[in-house]
Amino acid sequence: MPKIKTNRAAAKRFKKTGSGKVKYSKSFGSHILAKKSRKRKRDLRQSHILDEANMKNIKRLLPYW
């Protein structure tokens, strides 16, 4: 039985925390920022925790976590 490949796109976008939760960064925060409000840009800088509904999909993409 061959090894399962890790999805490299997902591996670059998601990090596992010490408690086992999945941390990720929001999109839309790198360019075309003039039209976005100060509050929106500030909120985009923060990292976020993945919800339980999407956790199953990420675990399938990253089998060796």
From Swiss-Prot:
PROSITE patterns referenced in this protein's UniProt entry, alphabetically: RIBOSOMAL_L35
GO cellular component: cytosolic large ribosomal subunit
Example GO BP: translation
Compositional bias of kind Basic residues: 33-43
GO MF term list: structural constituent of ribosome
InterPro entries: Ribosomal_bL35, Ribosomal_bL35-like, Ribosomal_bL35_CS, Ribosomal_bL35_sf
TM spans (from-to): none
Ranges where the record places region Disordered: 1-23, 29-48
Domain of life: Bacteria
Alphabetized UniProt keyword annotations: Ribonucleoprotein, Ribosomal protein
NCBIfam families: rpmI_bact
Family statement drawn from the similarity comment of this UniProt entry: Belongs to the bacterial ribosomal protein bL35 family.
Protein name listed in UniProt: Large ribosomal subunit protein bL35
Taxon lineage: Bacteria, Pseudomonadati, Thermodesulfobacteriota, Desulfobacteria, Desulfobacterales
